[in-house]
Amino acid sequence: MKKTFTLFTVLLTTVVTFAQTSSNAWNLQGSGTESDPYKISSAADFKSIADNISSTNTGAGEYFLVTADIDFGGTAESPVQLPAIAKAAITNITSVAWGFDGILDGGDHTISGIYHTNNANDADGKFNALFSSLGKSGVIKNLVFGADNYVSSYNYVSSIVSLSKGKIENCVNKANIIAANAFAGGICGYLVGGTGEIISSDNYGEIKAMTYAAGILGGSQSGTTITDYKYLVESCHNYGNLSTTNALGSAGIAGSFSGSIKNCVNEGKIEEAEKATGNYTAGIVAAYAYVVSCEGNTNKGSITGNKGVGGIIGTVMKGDDKDAVISSCINEGSVSGRGANIGGIVANSARVNGVITLTKCKNSGVVTTTAEDKTTIGNLRGNSNIVIGEDNVIADGLEHLALDPSSDGITNISLNQGAVSVKKYIDNKRVVIISKNRKYTLSGNEIR
């Protein structure tokens, strides 16, 4: 009787163990609750997620935990591609039907041994990362993509997520990443659908693309189809070097972006080759497309580009053509251009009605251009339609440039003329904004 009981116990234990590892929709150990998350301990477990995710099985409300450093085993001689979880959800950047909606905690473990080589303009070459699509409820946190990985893909390429509507937090990329076409980011390729957050994440890898390469985020979807912009990049740090083959769109934090960037730092070197069409190069954001919110960011890296080169922002595009304030940003790196619109904080604005104003910003980096025409260069701005507001600082010892404030503190805008077309002029030794035939101070108080 005792032997029979012992045999029954062994069989029961085996059945229970088997149930824990293979009876759920992911074929992972665990039950998917916060107290008993699905366990990811091998490359095979990531493959199991990729194989089993679908529009009806996105992981919504479920928890996943990486329990060990994971080596995929790839090398240059024997490449192993990214798992590209939820790629089936993507038709294009404007049509992302679903994504991974679970909560994945990397446990500060490192992913290694990925040698990704699919970089053609086809289904295999596009939208590659560990996760191709992250849904609105999806969270990926505390995950490290190691330095021995290598990623060369076509577009919207990154280490952690390709297209994201969800939240990426406390993730690190140490690998070099290349996009044969556009939009390479150290942490995420592209934010879509008006939502998506990247918080407290760092990049150490070198990021390259044909156009738009950035340390944290390649870019974000923008346009009139998005009615509410909730994109956020906050407290992120880039240490990696950036460049593009078209000399278009390199930046320390984000390439083409619409939304809020706060308290981010770039220490990477940004160096673009000499090209007549080169544009949009900056320490934080290469080009703001629509909604502009930029506060508390710092650039410490040296920046070399062609035109539209800024310590913080390269260019503010026309976009929604609304007013915006760039505040409390600091540039400490050298800013060097070869053409027009070179600025220590913001290089250029293409807005016709919207006024871009700088407040509480500081530049201590040397700003130069090799262009013969040196009328569109300044220690703070590279275009006269950008307003120098209150409490900005140009460090002592820097050369006075064409678009710097004059000695009496008045910006270089002709009295009551010249810039009236962009709704601002100097009145009584102060910059005044015109809106609907009324005058306002830079702080928004109406002048009667």
Question: Model-derived features: where do they sit?
Answer:
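Surface-exposed repetitive/solenoidal architectures
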Residues: Q20-G418
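Basic side chains
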Residues: K2-K3, H109, K141, K423-K424
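Terminal non-domain segments
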Residues: K2-F8, I40, D427-V431, S435
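Bacterial Sec-dependent N-terminal signal peptides
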Residues: M1-T21, L163
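C-terminal outer-membrane/trafficking sorting elements
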Residues: N416-R448
